[in-house]
Amino acid sequence: ELNLVGPNSSLAYIKSHHQLTVEQLMEGMLLPSGNDAAYVLAAAGGRILNPGAPTARDEVDAFLMGMNEYARTIGLCGSHFTCPDGYDYPENYSTLEDMALIARLAYEDEIIRKYSNLPSDRVTYYSGHIMEWKNTNWCIDPYTPEYYIPEMNGLKTGSVSKDYYCFLGSVEIEGQSFIFGFFGEEKMTDRFLDSKTAVQWLKTYIVK
């Protein structure tokens, strides 16, 4: 399944001889935005949904079929998924409203909460290999003070091209939780600067 990862993808640098737990693969998606981790998990899920799938492509497709069925059950109205990693493939699309709903549901998961709020980690794979991962969300890293937001506790970056960046952020301000997002930022860092503006707006006008 690793050979299905699109060109110029962000990676967790997983190799075919590595062995990782499901939790480590989730961390590999959340910190370095590893598209390779997403495909490994998708293929594993597809093997459960379709045990007789003859190829990795068929396994991933079985996962995507289940993914789209689940999307409908949770009320996504403007989304259709043709890849497990958010890559810019034909007919793979969503809306900010749908992504916000996904983010709200995802943040109920303990593993997602744990790793989406982790600036970096040194990971020892199940196979014993060691990897250093850094979170692509600079708003949670105090060592990037220009973008750091103390109230932020997640969630996920994304990009479609070198001039189309996305972000879903989660913050807690005086006991209240908020999720917000940006699609179509022209510069990678704009999403972090706009997040600081959004959080300041929340603190000024919403949380009093």
Model-derived regions: residue spans:
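Conserved catalytic neighborhood of penicillin-recognizing serine enzymes
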Residues: 2-45, 130-145, 152
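Conserved catalytic or metal-liganding residues and their short signature motifs at active sites
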Residues: 1-2, 91
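Penicillin-recognizing serine hydrolase domain
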Residues: 43-208
